[in-house]
């Protein structure tokens, strides 16, 4: 029910009393139902209401939105809120409207008539909207900036609040170039106070945000980063028999809780979700590889508690306000302490006891290092996130000290270990953690012939030639196809064969010689390091790929309600054979990438697309249907005689034995094609054939026939 605006009017009756604590608390209780302000909320509100710039650093769940929602009620006019995500704007506007507060948002997803209605209200003599949420991209447009200037000239723009302000800094873990353009707000709207809010910002990020926004003598407020209601724990994959099983047992032991599981790769999200569902845990995968309709369904099911667990890439979570999340699990190591803190902080927003669990694996660490190094090489000029930031989270996992202390120290906050009060595994079970670290050291030394497992030992090339498909924030934002970073071996192979730039002036024979030499050099180098064996596609890999496709196809068939029309087993075998035929000679990396691409295609395919691609399997299933009915007869067959060229073959069935059900399945014998010769083999065979023909022609043919044969050849 819409609340009466009387308390707001009473507060506005006296400008002197607008920033008073009593009036502000009255607004808080009336509109939001809270007894009092928390942390630095009151100081931030009083600063911006009095017209002063403010930089406010509050932990996730600390109530940052109150800092600009109360000022919108305390004074007439409009508060402009800049938000990075449309989902965040939608959620907050919906919540405010339910409380009777006039709020709107402008985005590209809205219908034209809705946007026109909002613009008409802004142009009216007395706009009804109190909070207007916009994206940084909209502010960058000339038309909207002109509208803001008009509102300002009419005295209707009270405050500019920039949520998730760390996005403006290239030092931050969530840098967005569009945020960088917000510095123009100070030039155009000089006397409007600016409130910058963030939950995660290291000291260098804080300074960068303040400088970039041109904040003038801002009040800098920093709440403690400590989340005392969260228990921090690290589990070591290298010491577990099966990380999937361990996670499943952990979730079962916690009961029917709401949780988020973050994964580095989309395929891991799919596989882990299937595993959890198979053991009776209600879960769903969420990532940009799914179409928008499926993502929306999964999100709604999780928010409404129809789904217990959501397994997602790290793009998920910003702007999602679900207070009863009891556990956040990182199934792969995050890229920085900032990322880990923000993501784990999505647990326990209701201040009730919650849990953060990080599954640490040496191989996962190597993958993340590989990703960060590639990112630095590609974006050395714009990206300021060196691998040194990654060292903090590695130390968090590989160190034996208090986890909470390491988190807070990374943000420049001193924290006595005694205050942890056994709210992390290192303080609660120090001997057990120390034993695990010793065992991890031994295991890593045995596997990698090195006694060092810290990041400084990562410069070796142990992960070369491995396939990987890393999550990319930009790709998730644009819903584009995911890139697969193929192995260095595959790239080298392509460069080796196609490396020589063949001039058009060269003759055919010279080009053939150059290509032949390049190929021989490549294959000779491969023989030396045995890369050909390393890159071979084993039967075990094919079996695991079939199982992966089977799981994905089964899930999609259930969603599309076409289980009866397509045999999931035969469909998965068909798709795997398709990938194997195309990429068996290219090697394991290309083959596995194609399998991953097929799994992602299954997640986005429509019913018609699925039926078209698997048409042979569908038609095969339909052909088999009429054959199955007669075979279910239970009457025994006595004697069947067949005559063939005068010979009688008798097929007897014993009446006293139970009749076995006959199953007729088409024999799909694989078509064995001749092996494709390499380029060198092809050239050599060609020369041998030419020499043979010349020898034969010299025995009994005249001089013209060899030339004719060669011409035909």
Curated annotation (Swiss-Prot):
Residues 246-391 form the Helicase C-terminal domain. Residues 465-499, 638-657, 694-713 are annotated as: Disordered. GO terms for biological process: DNA recombination. Expressed in roots, seedlings, young leaves, shoots, shoot apical mersitem, inflorescences, flowers, siliques and seeds. It catalyses: Couples ATP hydrolysis with the unwinding of duplex DNA by translocating in the 3'-5' direction; ATP + H2O = ADP + phosphate + H(+). NCBIfam families: recQ_fam. PANTHER family: ATP-DEPENDENT DNA HELICASE Q-LIKE 3, DNA HELICASE RECQ FAMILY MEMBER. It is an enzyme of class 5 (isomerase). The keyword Isomerase applies. InterPro entries: DEAD/DEAH_box_helicase_dom, DNA_helicase_ATP-dep_RecQ, Helicase_ATP-bd, Helicase_C-like, P-loop_NTPase, RecQ_Zn-bd. CDD domains: DEXHc_RecQ, SF2_C_RecQ. The lineage of its organism: Eukaryota, Viridiplantae, Streptophyta, Embryophyta, Tracheophyta. Its main location: nucleus. This is ATP-dependent DNA helicase Q-like 3. Pfam families: DEAD, Helicase_C, RecQ_Zn_bind. Keywords: ATP-binding, Coiled coil, DNA-binding, Helicase, Hydrolase, Isomerase, Magnesium, Manganese, Metal-binding, Nucleotide-binding, Nucleus. Belongs to the helicase family. RecQ subfamily. SUPFAM superfamilies: P-loop containing nucleoside triphosphate hydrolases. Residues 696-706 have a biased composition (Basic and acidic residues). One of its GO terms (cellular component) is nucleus. It is found in: Nucleus. Its cofactor is Mg(2+); Mn(2+). Residues 508-543 form a coiled coil. ATP binds at residues 58-65. It comes from the Eukaryota. 3'-5' DNA helicase that may play a role in the repair of DNA. Exhibits an ATP or dATP-dependent DNA-helicase activity. Cannot use GTP/dGTP, CTP/dCTP or UTP/dUTP as nucleotide cofactors. Catalyzes DNA strand annealing. On nicked Holliday junctions, unwinds the lagging strand. Cannot act on intact Holliday junctions. Does not unwind G-quadruplex DNA. GO terms for molecular function: 3'-5' DNA helicase activity; ATP binding; ATP hydrolysis activity; DNA/DNA annealing activity; four-way junction helicase activity; helicase activity; metal ion binding.
């Amino acid at each position: 029910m819409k609340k009466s605006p009387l308390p707001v009017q009473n507060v506005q009756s006296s400008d002197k009393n607008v920033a008073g604590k009593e009036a502000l608390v009255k607004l808080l209780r009336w509109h939001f139902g809270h007894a009092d302000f928390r942390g630095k909320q009151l100081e931030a509100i009083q600063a911006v209401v009095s017209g002063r710039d403010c930089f406010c650093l509050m932990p996730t769940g600390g109530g940052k939105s109150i800092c600009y929602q109360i000022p919108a009620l305390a004074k007439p006019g409009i508060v402009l809120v800049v938000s990075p995500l449309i989902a965040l704007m939608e959620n907050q506007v919906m919540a405010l409207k339910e409380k009777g507060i006039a709020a709107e948002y402008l985005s590209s997803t809205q219908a034209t008539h809705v946007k026109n209605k909002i613009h008409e209200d802004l142009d009216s003599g007395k706009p009804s909207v109190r909070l207007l949420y916009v994206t940084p991209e909209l502010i960058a447009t000339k038309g909207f900036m002109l509208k803001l200037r008009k509102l300002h000239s009419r005295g209707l723009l009270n405050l500019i609040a920039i949520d998730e302000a760390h996005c403006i800094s290239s030092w931050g873990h969530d840098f967005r170039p569009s945020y960088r353009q917000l510095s123009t707000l100070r030039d155009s709207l000089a006397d409007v106070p600016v409130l910058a809010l963030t939950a995660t910002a290291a000291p260098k990020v804080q300074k960068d945000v303040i400088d970039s926004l041109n904040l003038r003598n801002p009040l800098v407020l920093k709440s403690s980063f400590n989340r005392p209601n969260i228990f921090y724990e690290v589990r070591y994959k290298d010491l577990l028999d099966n990380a999937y099983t361990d996670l499943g047992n952990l979730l079962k032991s916690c009961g029917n809780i709401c949780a988020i599981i973050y994964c580095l790769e989309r395929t891991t999200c799919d596989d882990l979700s299937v595993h959890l569902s198979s053991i009776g845990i209600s879960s769903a995968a969420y990532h940009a590889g799914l179409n928008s309709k499926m993502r929306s369904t999964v999100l709604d099911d999780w928010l409404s508690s129809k789904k217990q667990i959501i397994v997602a890439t790290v793009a998920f979570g910003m702007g999602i306000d679900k207070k009863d999340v009891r556990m956040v699990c990182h199934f792969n190591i995050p890229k920085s302490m900032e990322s880990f803190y923000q993501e784990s902080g999505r647990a326990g927003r209701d201040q009730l006891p919650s849990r953060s669990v990080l599954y640490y694996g040496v191989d996962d660490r190597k993958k993340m290092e590989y990703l960060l190094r590639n990112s630095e090489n590609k974006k050395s000029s714009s990206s300021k996130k060196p691998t040194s930031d990654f060292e903090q989270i590695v130390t968090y996992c590989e160190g034996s000290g208090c986890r909470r202390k390491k988190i807070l120290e990374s943000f420049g906050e001193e924290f006595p270990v005694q205050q942890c009060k056994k709210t992390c595994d290192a303080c609660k079970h120090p001997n057990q953690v120390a034993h695990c670290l010793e065992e991890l050291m031994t295991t890593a030394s045995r596997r990698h012939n090195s006694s060092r497992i810290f990041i400084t030992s990562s410069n070796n090339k142990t992960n070369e030639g491995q396939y990987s498909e890393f999550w990319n924030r930009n790709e998730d934002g644009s819903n584009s196809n995911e890139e697969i970073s193929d192995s260095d071996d595959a790239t080298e192979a392509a460069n080796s064969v196609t490396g020589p730039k063949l001039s058009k002036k060269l003759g055919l024979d010279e080009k053939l010689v150059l290509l032949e030499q390049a190929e021989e050099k490549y294959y000779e180098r491969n023989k030396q390091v045995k890369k050909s064996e390393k890159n071979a596609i084993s039967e075990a890999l094919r079996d695991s790929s079939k199982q992966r496709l089977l799981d994905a196809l089964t899930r999609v068939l259930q969603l599309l309600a076409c289980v009866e029309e397509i045999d999931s087993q035969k469909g998965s075998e068909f798709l795997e054979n398709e990938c194997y035929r195309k990429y068996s000679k290219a090697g394991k990396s290309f083959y596995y990438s194609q399998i991953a691409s097929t799994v992602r295609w299954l997640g986005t395919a429509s019913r018609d697309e699925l039926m078209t691609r698997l048409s042979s399997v569908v038609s095969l299933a339909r052909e088999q249907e009429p054959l199955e009915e007669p075979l279910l007869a239970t009457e025994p067959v006595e004697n069947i005689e067949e005559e063939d060229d005068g010979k009688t073959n008798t097929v007897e069935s014993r009446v006293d034995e139970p009749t076995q059900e006959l199953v007729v399945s088409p024999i799909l014998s694989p078509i064995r094609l001749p092996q494709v010769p390499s380029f060198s083999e092809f050239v050599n065979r060609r020369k041998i054939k030419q020499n043979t023909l010349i020898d034969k022609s010299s025995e009994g043919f005249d001089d013209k026939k060899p030339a004719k044969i060669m011409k035909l050849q």
